[in-house]
Amino acid sequence: MDFKVSNRMSTLKGSAIREMFKAMADPTMISLAGGNPAAELFPNEILSEIAADILKNNPVGALQYGISEGNVALREKIIEFVKERENLEVSLDEITIVSGGQQAIEITAKILLNEGDSVIVEAPSFVGGLNAFRSYGANLVGVDVEEDGINIEMLKETIKSTPNVKLIYTIPNFQNPSGVTMSVEKRKALYEIARDNGIFIIEDNPYGELTFDGIKLPTIKSMDSEGVVLYSGSFSKILAPGLRLGYLIAPKNFTEKAVLGKQVSDVHTPCLPQLLALEFMNRYDIVELIGKMRELYKKKCNIMIDAMKEYLPSQITYTVPGGGLFVWCNAPGVDTLKLSQECVKEKVLIVPGNNFATDQSLVNNGFRLNFSTMPDDKIVEGVKRLGSVLKKYYN
């Protein structure tokens, strides 16, 4: 039966990244397009043992309905974790367990946005965040990302010239897609600007632990004394994304609304993944696992950067990230949507920059590469194939 799509859904397009998974059915295809963590670091055997123990000894806790706020013991464990790792002082009634960091963004949009309200985002920005805001009829306004994070002067001018700004969305650590990390000075400035203008900040921090040198900058939330910052954390990049497990840290009055948002979305995050994460953190050192991730991703990033130096045309500029999963490239004069289509023919996948833009219809010269999932030799071969396509534009 034919049907008319709602206004909120009519603005959404399928993620090109998800569409590219279809091309991976070809065994000769090399994907530099994903955003997945390295599967070889999933603690499969440990989680299998924990799951068996839970289902044997606590089947009701795993399989019965739970509370919308999330498992109390897991929230208490996260409170310990963020105090130790991020210097955050959080109470139990300020944390909601969510079904991945994506849901933290979506619930925040649900709570705060009316159709036509404005959201300031980094340009470029995470497509999942952009689509969450689009689904609530938001006006998206981009502010450029510089080498040390969001352009503060441009942010000030954008706030002055844009009506009904409700939110600023930022990924300050190893940003998706740019790989850029925001400086401490800009974090402080961003917080003060938002506070002084009565605007909430969503601080999305899925990559913060994946710093190659082990040095972590203070979160914006750690600077927050007035409930301005809504902090999204995730287990997707430090344990396993299939658990669909994250957390939203917010003031108590906001958390109460987030719980209502959970109740109308999915009632609660599934209990078994919550218990798996809790017991993993109780029995094993998650920081040790994070250390292995840092070591592996640093090696893979270096392999990619070395290959880019060797095989890409000199006209291509790119970030050299200090952590995370991504390298952002700029190809002057090249429509990277067309480039990505040509790359498919050469058996390599990249993500064109328009996917990360507030206006996806405009020609974009940027593209994103991922180094976390492919074997080392395929990273090199993938960059080599990409270089052969790019050289056609510059020779």
Where are the regions that the model predicts?
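Conserved core segment of the aminotransferase class I/II
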Residues: 225-295
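PLP-dependent enzyme catalytic core of the Aspartate aminotransferase-like
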Residues: 1, 345, 360-395
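N-terminal small-domain helix-loop-helix segment of the aminotransferase-like
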Residues: 10-100, 107, 282, 349, ...
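Conserved core of the PLP fold type I
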Residues: 61-198, 202, 208-226, 297, ...
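Conserved C-terminal alpha-helix-loop-beta "cap" of PLP-dependent enzymes
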Residues: 329-368, 381
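Conserved glycine-rich beta-strand-loop-beta hairpin in the small C-terminal domain of fold type I
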Residues: 278, 295-305, 317-330, 344
